[in-house]
A protein has these predicted regions:
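Positively charged, amphipathic and often flexible ligand-engagement surfaces
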Residues: 1-274
């Protein structure tokens, strides 16, 4: 059972609950990105089981005609198990009749994740997407590589606590780098980009860049964060809500607390019963 403290950020324990949540979003003009919670598996059986669930989830999205896609974490489907990640990702991409996002985890996974994205982006003519993190110092060169590929790229600020020698530190610095990367993406990407941000200033910046360069884009935000703003924004631009579900909620919830002071305050109020 998901405790009340985390329930604001997680859409239930089963994909049926998560899909019901997305159906409600669809009524208000927001699409869904469904993610089964789980990461860093070291047993093949667990990785295969979650890959099987993603395939079943994709089939259910199609059956229900829900406006949604799926997003998978590499370490969840076998990144730390020889051969499992590549095999399970191929199974998911081949079976899914919806768009498939590949999430980015900490810096140790970046190379293998981008390589997997490139392989499937070319094979599917762009029916997959990948996330990159603005706080990593390598992201500028990664974006130059990705600009030559089909598929979408999601830019986020980065939720992992990375070493200072490889990552930008401090909100002002990361915000400036994010803006620079966003401008490059609007100039260089043809297949559209995803702005992963709740920051009104960044979203406004993206709107201005779209007006200047004409590049198609969407905004992606999280369940439980500025949801009223998501519904308002959906009147002007495609909006996707990242919708996690499942029983393995703690690591995801902890990253959300680290990201935003308001999230931590929400958790504190929940603990105190206010």
């Amino acid at each position: 059972m998901i405790p009340p403290i985390a329930n604001n950020f997680v859409a239930g324990e089963t994909y049926s609950e998560a899909l019901n949540h997305v159906d409600e979003l669809n009524v208000r003009g927001v699409s869904g990105i469904l993610n089964l919670l789980g990461e860093h598996y070291d047993e093949r059986e667990a990785a295969d089981a979650d890959a099987d669930e993603y395939i079943a989830l994709a089939e259910e999205i199609e059956r229900r005609n829900t406006d949604a896609c799926i997003s998978v974490k590499p370490s969840q489907i076998g990144l730390e198990i020889d051969g499992a990640f590549q095999e399970n990702l191929a199974r998911i991409v081949d079976a899914a009749n919806c768009f498939v996002w590949i999430d980015m985890e900490d810096h140790t996974t970046t190379d293998v994740t981008l390589d997997a994205f490139e392989e499937h982006a070319r094979a599917t003519d762009g029916n997959v997407g990948v996330c990159v993190q603005a706080n990593l110092k390598r992201t500028g060169s990664d974006l130059q590589r990705l600009a030559e590929l089909p598929g979408k790229v999601r830019l986020v600020k980065g939720a992992y606590d990375e070493p200072g020698e490889i990552a930008h530190k401090g909100k002002v610095t990361v915000d400036a780098v994010y803006r620079d990367h966003l401008e490059y993406m609007f100039q260089a990407f043809d297949d559209g980009i995803a702005v992963g941000s709740h920051d009104p200033a960044m979203i406004e910046h993206a709107q201005h860049l779209h007006e200047e360069y004409g590049t198609p884009y969407e905004v992606q935000m999280l369940t439980g964060v500025r949801e009223s703003a998501q519904f308002d924004l959906a009147n002007d631009v495609p909006v996707y809500q990242y919708v996690p579900y499942g029983t393995k909620w703690f690591s995801y919830f902890y990253r959300r607390l680290r990201e935003r002071k308001s999230n931590a305050l929400f958790a504190a109020r929940a603990i105190l019963g206010n």
